[in-house]
């Protein structure tokens, strides 16, 4: 109610290892609270590392999404690592096309995980450059307007 009284939308991020960690749980929570001021911050990587596909997650969650960010990953939960976009094999083209098919028109941004930031050789400028190049190429190859 506090957010609604100020016209603020809150975005919850389903997260691997958390109690809200799959499409069913976040959709149940949204249904229980039933507020137009509660949406999803959709990070597909948290679904990918537990084996939930783009085709399963995107159609369910994109209609309730107010923001999304992406990063790469390697491995499967519990033995996984988040990576800089472009360091892994995530299919950004397929993801962008799936988001577009749902009518999502909001922001899609890159996230650099704390796992990456803790690397002794972490370079934020190199991470930003790789992220930009990776996502820019993906948008172009997907035929999705960056708006």
Question: Where are the regions a protein language model picked out?
Answer:
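C-terminal helical cap(s) of enzyme catalytic domains, especially alpha/beta-barrels
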Residues: 120-146
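Hydrophobic faces of well-ordered beta-strands that scaffold small-molecule active sites
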Residues: 10-12, 38-42, 66-70, 106-112
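Active-site acidic/histidine proton-transfer and metal-coordination neighborhood
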Residues: 1-40, 49, 142-146
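Gly/Pro-rich active-site loop or hairpin
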Residues: 19, 23-27, 31, 46-105, ...
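Generic helix-packing signal
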Residues: 7, 30, 61, 132-135
């Amino acid at each position: 109610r506090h957010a609604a009284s100020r016209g603020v939308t809150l975005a919850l991020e389903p997260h691997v290892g958390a109690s809200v960690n799959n499409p069913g749980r976040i959709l149940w929570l949204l249904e229980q609270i039933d507020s137009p001021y509660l949406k999803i911050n959709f990070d597909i990587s948290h679904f990918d590392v537990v084996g939930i596909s783009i085709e399963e997650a995107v159609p369910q969650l994109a209609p309730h999404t107010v923001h999304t960010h992406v990063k790469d990953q390697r491995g499967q939960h519990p033995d996984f690592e988040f990576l800089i976009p472009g360091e892994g094999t995530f299919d950004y083209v397929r993801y962008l096309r799936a988001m577009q098919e749902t009518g999502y028109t909001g922001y899609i941004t890159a996230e650099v995980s704390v796992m990456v930031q803790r690397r002794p050789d972490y370079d934020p400028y190199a991470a930003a450059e790789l992220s930009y190049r990776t996502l820019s190429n993906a948008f172009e190859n997907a035929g999705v307007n960056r708006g």
